[in-house]
Amino acid sequence: MQQYIAGRYAQSLYAVCGPRLESDANKFLGLLSENNFLSFAKVKTSTKLHVLDRLHLPCELKNLCKLLLANHRGFLCTTVLLGYIEIVKKNRKEADARVESYSRLSATAKKEVADALLIKFPYLKKINIAQKVNRSILGGLTIKINSIMIDLSIAGRLAKCKSIGQSTILEIFQ
């Protein structure tokens, strides 16, 4: 339910401002990741409003936070801003891909992965690669883009072979 409510606020913010608040929203999210004072129930609303007034934020962003606080939903601010940024990226036909590999990828390899994903997903114009090193995959890559998972890892291939082997053995003995 909270995700739905936050999504409605994010859509409203995008309808009013379009993509022009994206950089300010990212900066404010960085600040909230260090100290999400808007979600603290023990901090008075008047104190939160005073802090918001002191921050150099666009008036639309301040008004959104004030509205959330007035409706006792200050804890949704981070979720709303993340939803807004997702809407902006979606309208620019941009996506984030999380790539896990055994070792760090070079810039050339990242570009090749992004280019291959652009071919696989022609409706996208840009793919941002976020890389994570994961030694448990033994080699290869796993790619997660939106809700799609592409497993090109050795560990994934071994698990698939093991599954096929087990099902074959079960068929033999039945």
UniProtKB/Swiss-Prot annotation:
InterPro entries: ATPase_OSCP/d_CS, ATPase_OSCP/dsu. It is a peripheral membrane protein. Keywords: ATP synthesis, Cell inner membrane, Cell membrane, CF(1), Hydrogen ion transport, Ion transport, Membrane, Transport. It is found in: Cell inner membrane. The keyword Transmembrane helix does not apply. One of its GO terms (cellular component) is proton-transporting ATP synthase complex. PROSITE patterns: ATPASE_DELTA. The keyword Ion transport applies. One of its GO terms (molecular function) is proton-transporting ATP synthase activity, rotational mechanism. Transmembrane segments: none annotated. It comes from the Bacteria. F(1)F(0) ATP synthase produces ATP from ADP in the presence of a proton or sodium gradient. F-type ATPases consist of two structural domains, F(1) containing the extramembraneous catalytic core and F(0) containing the membrane proton channel, linked together by a central stalk and a peripheral stalk. During catalysis, ATP synthesis in the catalytic domain of F(1) is coupled via a rotary mechanism of the central stalk subunits to proton translocation. F-type ATPases have 2 components, F(1) - the catalytic core - and F(0) - the membrane proton channel. F(1) has five subunits: alpha(3), beta(3), gamma(1), delta(1), epsilon(1). F(0) has three main subunits: a(1), b(2) and c(10-14). The alpha and beta chains form an alternating ring which encloses part of the gamma chain. F(1) is attached to F(0) by a central stalk formed by the gamma and epsilon chains, while a peripheral stalk is formed by the delta and b chains. Belongs to the ATPase delta chain family. This is ATP synthase subunit delta. It comes from Neorickettsia sennetsu (strain ATCC VR-367 / Miyayama).
